[in-house]
């Protein structure tokens, strides 16, 4: 009985730590190039991220950078700053999956998974079709 209670205690502790980890992506992150900060938030048990800082928010003419590469003509005038680029991620117990990432430099949207690395950084994996055919980059938490 004593062993059973100890196992039960460790199991409960494990589930508690596990459930706390699901929001580890929430917060502000700097992308791999250092050109942008993305604030990841949780809404209705899904995770979303928008650009909240740009190293160069203005174009070469001094105008606010807009989403010029967007395939939707009506969105091309939308500012990059404030643009939601991560959408609809769900936590599957190990990583955040089933989401989409939008690349304003190309105007393309990709399937995406996010993994929390052991050092606390995020591994962002964008892909088309299969996850093995894609590109990864590492984002660091803004301190």
Regions found by a protein language model. Give the residues of each.
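Bacterial Sec-dependent N-terminal signal peptides
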Residues: 1-21
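A short, polar/proline- and glycine-enriched secondary-structure boundary/capping micro-motif
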Residues: 51, 59-62, 108-111, 133-138
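Short, solvent-exposed loop/hinge segments that bridge or flank secondary-structure elements
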Residues: 31-69, 73-74, 78-80, 84-91
């Amino acid at each position: 009985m004593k062993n059973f209670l100890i196992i039960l205690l460790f199991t409960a502790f494990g589930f508690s730590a596990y459930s706390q980890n699901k929001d580890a992506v929430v917060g502000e992150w700097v992308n791999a190039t250092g050109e942008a900060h993305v604030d990841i938030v949780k809404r209705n048990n899904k995770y979303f991220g928008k650009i909240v800082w740009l190293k160069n928010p203005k174009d070469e003419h001094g105008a606010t950078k807009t989403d010029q590469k967007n395939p939707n003509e009506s969105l091309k005038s939308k500012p990059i700053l404030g643009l939601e680029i991560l959408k609809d991620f769900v936590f599957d117990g190990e990583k955040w999956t089933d989401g989409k990432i939008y690349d304003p430099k190309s105007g393309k949207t990709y399937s995406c998974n996010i993994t929390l690395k052991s050092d606390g950084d995020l591994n962002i994996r964008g892909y088309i079709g299969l996850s093995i055919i894609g590109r990864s980059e590492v984002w660091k938490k803004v301190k």
